[in-house]
């Protein structure tokens, strides 16, 4: 691998593995609102949001940090009231109780409109128009009297293709930015085109000082889990797995149960809207959690070295990034399938596996979890993460025994990269109708 290739991959990881507070879809909407408000230059009197189906799906049932509330309206209100676009996916980190109360009043005043954006194919699309009627005073030459006139102001911001990727900005009709939406391949560039072998080679040979930044993912995501253990968030799966005597009699107090408890606990806190940052991957905090904590706990429980941990985390996160390159940011496929595949690679590496065993682990994961639907971000995501992480451990164990699902079985190909493309084809193309059905069910449940 050339130095330029290595540099390109490091830059890719640093773009995709970033801190986030709260579920990234409503937070991305808040970010877009914050930018539109900044362009407007004052508090908007009305905000219109036109969103893709996948953004709507992932924002309907998830907690918004620091609010005790769920869903888009409060995220939009806070984006306008206290959001700062310079903070990126931590846009709401300065939320206060007073701001939440002001946001509730904004919602009660029906100042926020949320609609499905029709006629688009992009799955990650956020269009915000913020408007206000400012009062301007003008003095007549005939007298000292002044007259007040209403001067309508508006600003539009559009994010598409990535959770922080602004493609359009305007103020009162004047276009400030109009950037064409690039494909995933164009965004990544040819230099960062990946294969599983390239991912493995990079993770196992890159100079340690160039990739040790990945340890920040361990620090943030483990802290999120430990915060969760102290409270009662979501379905409390992580806390239950850690403390329940019933659980102890079934799973015991071992590496497996500890991995499950830490990983699901971090998800419990995040989906409940706890004001705690996590390290995300490819725009998803849950993916970042799932790619990080199983490896972190396995390494701690088995006394692995700092270098082994760094390389395993790098392998996991870069595998997730690689799979997402062809799957896309949002899809009908649950993101834990992808993230747990990354963690299975990292755990296999920590078990002493080489490239062949890591390939086997990926094949086993694809054979098992392909087709798990995403029905939005919500507290029960922790249950899906538990399924994904359990499978990642089983897949790694099988791989170390040289057991691999073969190409005569289902969607598995002899070439692991082709198996990955089979997975992402199903998730990004074949499950589109599933996505429509899921959103239709979610929006017509009558609850």
Give the label of every model feature segment:
Residues 5-40, 44:
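N-terminal signal-anchor module of multipass membrane proteins
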Residues 19-35, 276-293, 335-338:
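Conserved phosphate/anionic-ligand binding catalytic regions in large, soluble enzymes, centered on
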Residues 26-42, 288-304, 344-352:
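Alpha-helical support elements that line or immediately flank enzyme active sites
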């Amino acid at each position: 691998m050339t130095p330029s290739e290595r540099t390109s991959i490091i830059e890719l990881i640093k773009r995709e593995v970033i801190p986030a507070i709260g579920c990234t879809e409503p937070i991305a909407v808040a970010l877009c609102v914050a930018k539109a408000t900044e362009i407007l230059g004052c508090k908007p009197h009305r905000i219109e949001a036109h969103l893709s189906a996948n953004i709507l799906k992932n924002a309907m049932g998830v907690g918004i940090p620091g609010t005790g509330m769920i869903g888009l309206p409060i995220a939009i209100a806070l984006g306008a009231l206290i959001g700062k676009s310079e903070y990126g996916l931590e846009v709401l980190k300065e939320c206060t109780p007073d701001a939440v109360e002001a946001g509730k009043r904004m919602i009660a005043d029906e100042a926020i409109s949320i609609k499905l954006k029709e006629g688009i194919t992009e799955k990650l699309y956020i269009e915000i128009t913020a408007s206000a009627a400012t009062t301007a005073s003008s003095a007549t030459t005939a007298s000292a009297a002044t007259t007040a006139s209403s001067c309508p102001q508006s600003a539009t911001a559009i994010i598409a293709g990535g959770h922080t990727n602004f493609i359009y900005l305007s103020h009162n009709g004047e276009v400030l930015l109009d950037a064409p939406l690039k494909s995933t391949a164009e965004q990544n560039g040819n230099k960062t085109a990946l294969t599983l072998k390239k991912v493995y080679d990079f993770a196992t040979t890159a100079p340690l000082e160039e990739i040790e930044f990945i340890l920040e993912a361990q620090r943030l995501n483990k802290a999120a889990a430990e915060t969760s253990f102290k409270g009662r968030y979501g379905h409390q799966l992580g806390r239950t797995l850690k403390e329940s005597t019933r659980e102890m009699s079934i799973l015991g107090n071992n590496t497996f149960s500890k991995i499950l408890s830490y990983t699901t606990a971090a998800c419990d806190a995040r989906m409940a809207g706890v004001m705690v940052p996590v390290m995300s991957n490819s725009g998803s905090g849950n993916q970042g959690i799932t790619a990080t904590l199983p490896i972190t706990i396995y390494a701690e429980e088995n006394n692995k070295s700092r270098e082994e941990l760094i390389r395993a985390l790098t392998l996991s996160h870069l595998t997730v990034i690689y799979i997402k390159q062809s799957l896309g940011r949002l899809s009908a496929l649950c993101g834990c399938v992808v993230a747990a595949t990354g963690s299975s690679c990292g755990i296999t590496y920590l078990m002493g596996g080489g490239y062949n065993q890591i390939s086997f682990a990926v094949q086993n994961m694809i054979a098992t979890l392909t087709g798990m639907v995403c029905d939005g971000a919500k507290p029960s995501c922790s249950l899906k993460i538990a399924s994904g992480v359990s499978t990642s451990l089983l897949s790694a164990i099988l791989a170390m025994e040289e057991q691999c699902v073969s190409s005569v079985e289902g969607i598995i190909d002899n070439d692991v990269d082709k198996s990955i493309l089979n997975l992402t084809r199903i998730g990004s193309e074949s499950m589109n109708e599933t996505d429509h059905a899921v959103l239709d069910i979610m929006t017509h449940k009558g609850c």
